[in-house]
Curated annotation (Swiss-Prot):
NCBIfam families: PRK04987.1. CDD domains: QFR_TypeD_subunitC. One of its GO terms (cellular component) is plasma membrane. Part of an enzyme complex containing four subunits: a flavoprotein (FrdA), an iron-sulfur protein (FrdB), and two hydrophobic anchor proteins (FrdC and FrdD). Belongs to the FrdC family. This is Fumarate reductase subunit C. HAMAP family: Fumarate_red_C (MF_00708). One of its GO terms (molecular function) is succinate dehydrogenase activity. Anchors the catalytic components of the fumarate reductase complex to the cell membrane, binds quinones. It comes from the Bacteria. Keywords: Cell inner membrane, Cell membrane, Membrane, Transmembrane, Transmembrane helix. It is found in: Cell inner membrane.
Length: 127
């Protein structure tokens, strides 16, 4: 064993606040918290649907609470942020070629958003 002391650089807990890239990364990752609450709310809603009309009405009243509505809006915005970042990464991760030529990145991203809009429209019509 060596007797020398290795240099250990001190890292502050807030090191990520100094870099815009890491701040954005932390913001994007923090959006999972309202999504967890949204998922729990829906799970409780399914349970109350099984329990009967009174439990269902109680859950509907709970979902009408302004705090819950705000959490759901934040969860929606977080989901849209995730979709935006993932869709913008897609052309870099998996470049698409048609007839040997690369497809423009904007077309790939717009096609993904069009697919989301189309599927959302179908869900709205069916439900």
């Amino acid at each position: 064993m060596s007797n020398r002391k290795p240099y250990v650089r001190e890292v502050k807990r807030t090191w990520w606040k100094d870099h815009p890239f890491y701040r954005f990364y932390m913001l994007r990752e923090a959006t999972v918290l309202p999504l967890i609450l949204f998922t729990l709310f829906l799970t409780v809603g399914l349970g109350s649907l099984v329990k009967g009309p009174e439990a269902w009405q109680t859950w509907l009243n709970f979902m009408a609470n302004p705090v819950v509505i705000a959490i759901n809006i934040v969860a929606l915005l977080g989901s849209l942020l995730h979709a935006h970042t993932f869709f913008s990464m897609m052309p870099q991760v998996m470049p698409i070629r048609l007839k040997g030529k690369p497809v423009d990145k904007k077309i790939i991203v717009l096609a993904q958003w069009a697919a989301v809009a189309f599927i959302s429209l179908i869900v709205l019509i069916v439900v």
